[in-house]
Amino acid sequence: MDLKNSSALPHITVATVVEKASKFLLVKEKANGQIVYNQPAGHLKSGESLTAAALRETFEETTWRIKITSLLGIYNYLSAANGVTYIRHCFIAEPIWQEPEAKLDSDILDAVWLSIDEIIQKTAELRSPLVLTVLKDYVAGNSYPL
C-alpha cells in the first residue's frame, strides 16, 4: 500500500472559533455543490505549524487578522461524503482587525458573524457536525494552553 497517497491516512486540519459581541465568525462557502457554513478552517501546508495554519486560513477565508489565545480541542471526524478521516485542531482566537481590501479565497462566498442561536437554526446547512460540536465545547468553557 502506498501510504504517502493513501486515503487511509487522516487529513490534518485546523479551525478557529472567533467570537465578537456574542457572535461567531463563520464562512459561507460552496462545498460539493452546496452552500454551507463552517468555521474558518483548512489543511496544514508542508512545514507549517498548526497555529500558523490557523492564522493563515482565518485570514484567507475571512480577511480577519486574529490572535490565537488557546487550544479548544482536537477532533476526529470521518466524512461520510468521501470516507476521509479528518483530525481537526481547533483554536480559540480574538479578532484583531479586518483588511476589507483583501480578497476572500475563491471558494468562500462570504464571512459572516452569527449568534449561537442563528447557527443552530442553520444546522442542516453546516459543513459538518464539528461546527456545532466545537461551539458547544467553547460555550462549555473548554480551553487548553498553547
Over which residues does each language-model region extend?
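Short, solvent-exposed loop/turn elements at beta->coil junctions and helix N-caps
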Residues: 4, 72-80
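Active-site-adjacent beta-strand/loop module that shapes the phosphate/pyrophosphate-binding cleft
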Residues: 77-100, 112, 134-139
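Conserved Nudix-box catalytic region and its N-terminal flanking loop in Nudix hydrolases
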Residues: 20-60
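Residue-level preference for beta-strand/loop junctions
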Residues: 8-10, 35, 85-87
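Nudix hydrolase/Nudix homology domain
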Residues: 34-37, 106-146
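Acidic, metal-coordinating catalytic segment for phosphate/diphosphate chemistry
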Residues: 1-15
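A short coil-to-beta-strand element that immediately follows conserved catalytic motifs
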Residues: 65-73
